[in-house]
Design a protein with these regions (language model features):
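Acyl-donor (CoA/ACP) binding surface of acyl/acetyltransferases
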Residues: 1-25, 67, 71-187
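Generic structural signal for secondary-structure transition and capping sites
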Residues: 36-37, 64-65, 127
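A short helix-loop-beta-strand connector motif used in the catalytic cores of GNAT acetyltransferases and
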Residues: 57-69
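An amphipathic alpha-helix signature
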Residues: 22-29, 49, 53, 57
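Conserved GNAT-fold acetyl-CoA-binding loop/helix
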Residues: 36-54
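DNA-binding alpha-helical recognition surfaces that contact promoter or target DNA
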Residues: 30, 54, 144, 148
Length: 187
């Protein structure tokens, strides 16, 4: 488990480890249940306090993933969440995801900063070799965001997830740790 006082700081936002506090729980529930966030997740059922706390215990606090609350630098206001899930220490990889829960914060370049800070943690602190992301094909903004930050498309997954009675396509993108990218001579 991460030190609860840890901060990964950028220009506009910083990341701090999620806690099981009432504030973090209420924010996650509100954000994940909002119509601007929920449609972009595979798990579409309403989030509950009990379900969220179980997730924290079984996944985050058990070391199977890392989840951060994203806060504004200027006033410490929580505005979203970022995470690395399905952490595989042997293969040194994890799945990346994030969301900005506060609508007013969208369109300010914060998503790009969150991605950069999360990759800094993944590659420099966890020493991951690879980070991947599965994104619904009908979410071009997220695909564009990760692609602009060094993620490359590895697969287009047709009818990958059955969500709300409809099969949806997904795009699998990944980024190799820049410190480990092989040159042509090394291949």
């Amino acid at each position: 488990m991460l030190d609860p006082n840890k901060r990964i700081t950028g220009k506009q936002v910083y990341l701090r480890p999620i806690t099981d506090s009432e504030e973090d729980t209420n924010n996650i529930i509100r954000w994940r249940n909002s119509e601007t966030v929920r449609p972009y997740f595979i798990y579409q059922k309403p989030f509950t306090v009990e379900g969220h706390k179980q997730w924290l215990e079984k996944e985050i606090f058990a070391g199977k993933g890392f989840q951060f609350i994203v806060c504004r630098v200027e006033d410490d206001k929580p505005i979203g969440c970022t995470y690395l899930r399905d952490y595989d220490a042997h293969s040194r990889k994890a799945e990346y995801g994030m969301f900005i829960g506060e609508q007013i914060e969208k369109g300010k370049g914060i998503g790009t900063e969150i991605l950069g800070l999360t990759m800094e943690f993944a590659f420099k602190e966890l020493k991951l070799h690879k980070v991947f992301s599965r994104i619904f094909a009908d979410n071009p903004a997220s695909i564009h965001s990760v692609s602009n930050n060094g993620f490359e498309q590895e697969a287009y997954l047709k009818d990958e997830e059955f969500v709300n009675g409809v099969y949806r396509d997904m795009v699998l993108l990944a980024k190799i740790n820049p410190d480990e990218v092989k040159t042509e001579e090394q291949k």
